[in-house]
UniProtKB/Swiss-Prot annotation:
Protein name: Protein OPG195
Alphabetic keyword roster: Late protein, Signal
Conditions for induction: Expressed in the late phase of the viral replicative cycle.
Taxonomic superkingdom: Viruses
InterPro entries (alphabetical): Apoptosis_reg_M-T4 (IPR016399), M-T4_sf (IPR038687), Poxvirus_T4p_N (IPR007580)
Family under the similarity heading: Belongs to the chordopoxvirinae B9 protein family.
Leader peptide range in chain numbering: 1-17
Length: 77
């Protein structure tokens, strides 16, 4: 029963999906891109010592908690 609920909920969390051929000459190879929106309740962040340089922006900060990683652009904070 639990697996049936997961199967029924999975399509509802996909907000975008596109399928295209990897190469126009190949008919059997396809690329798949799926966007997911994940909402985590009771997220408890912990500061890490990891700092990331984002080439399109300035610096980013990685925060971890409950198995999720959060990367933020410090220009917008």
């Amino acid at each position: 029963m639990r697996s049936l609920i997961i199967v029924l909920l999975f399509p509802s969390i996909i907000y975008s999906m596109s399928i295209r051929r990897c190469e126009k000459t190949e008919e059997e190879t396809w690329g798949l891109k799926i966007g997911l929106c994940i909402i985590a309740k009771d997220f408890y962040p912990e500061r890490t010592d990891c700092s990331v340089h984002l080439p399109t922006a300035s610096e980013g900060l990685i925060t971890e908690g409950n198995g999720f990683r959060d990367i933020r652009n410090t220009d917008k904070l």
